[in-house]
Amino acid sequence: MPEQGLADAFGVTEEARAKINLALHVTGQRPDGYHLLDMLVTFADCGDRLGFLPAQADAFTLSGRFGETLAGDGGANLVIRARDLLREAVGTLAFPVHIHLQKNLPVASGIGGGSADAAAALRGLMRLWGTRLPVAALATLALKLGADVPMCLESRPLIARGIGEEIEAVPDLPAFAMVLANPLKGVSTPEVFRRLKAKNNPPLTLAQTAGWLATIGAARNDLEPPAREAVPEIAAISAMLQAEGALLARMSGSGATCFGIFADMAAARDAAAALHEARPDWYFQATETVSGGM
């Protein structure tokens, strides 16, 4: 059996890349309560890792810096739910499996960790079980797991609209040197939406007259002001990123993770090191996002 804590020791491995909301516009709300969003999304080269191995009986193990946070999650974990839904869809091909989740990203932090894990579970299990679902069926299954899971299946730059199910690739979005920063203080997504003052905001437009950085800067995250009210550390962490030379700093998703875009990876690594020295109790990670051409 592979050593616990090392997802790479398993026969099949998958990356669960951090999902970064470069922009998030809340444009309305459906009668069922779901909010309508316009999002510009990219993915980082850091994230969780999952390993998969045939087993006598289903097993799920955890490791990583934030693994203990999920230890009591049990059957509610999205990875387990993804396994069970996919097994229902493929039937007898789905033999028992040991899944190991190396949890490197903060939990409930606005960078799609659980959704990315679920998407990686679907990809890895289809490889292990030697099966594929039709594109439409896989998209439907992914949406059952959560609004962010379909885009995490893509794990490439995209625009997502609706509740996240309307996906359009953005092939010309470049890679960015970035620092992810999180004060390791939980943010309640329902509370952030409750604090949101306007739910019918202007949609996302991408007029690239002055380059991608200016285009992203002209967009916004409508959830950042209410999240800052709930967690004041978000404002502090954004200011710290800017003080370290970030060309743009913004919150991702419903928080509390913020990202800073830097001129290059050397600047990002230097900033992450300085920030970690200033606040060793917080989370800082230098990373590079994927490009649209991948």
UniProtKB/Swiss-Prot annotation:
Q: What is its EC number?
A: 2.7.1.148
Which SUPFAM superfamilies is this protein grouped with? GHMP Kinase, C-terminal domain, Ribosomal protein S5 domain 2-like
Q: Which pathway does it serve?
A: Isoprenoid biosynthesis; isopentenyl diphosphate biosynthesis via DXP pathway; isopentenyl diphosphate from 1-deoxy-D-xylulose 5-phosphate: step 3/6
**Residues bound to ATP:** P106, V107, A108, S109, G110, I111, G112, G113, G114, S115, A116
Catalyzed reactions per annotation? 4-CDP-2-C-methyl-D-erythritol + ATP = 4-CDP-2-C-methyl-D-erythritol 2-phosphate + ADP + H(+)
Protein family (similarity comment): Belongs to the GHMP kinase family. IspE subfamily.
Cite the HAMAP family for this sequence: IspE (MF_00061)
What is this protein's function? Catalyzes the phosphorylation of the position 2 hydroxy group of 4-diphosphocytidyl-2C-methyl-D-erythritol.
Q: What is this protein called?
A: 4-diphosphocytidyl-2-C-methyl-D-erythritol kinase
Q: Which organism is it from?
A: Rhizobium etli (strain ATCC 51251 / DSM 11541 / JCM 21823 / NBRC 15573 / CFN 42)
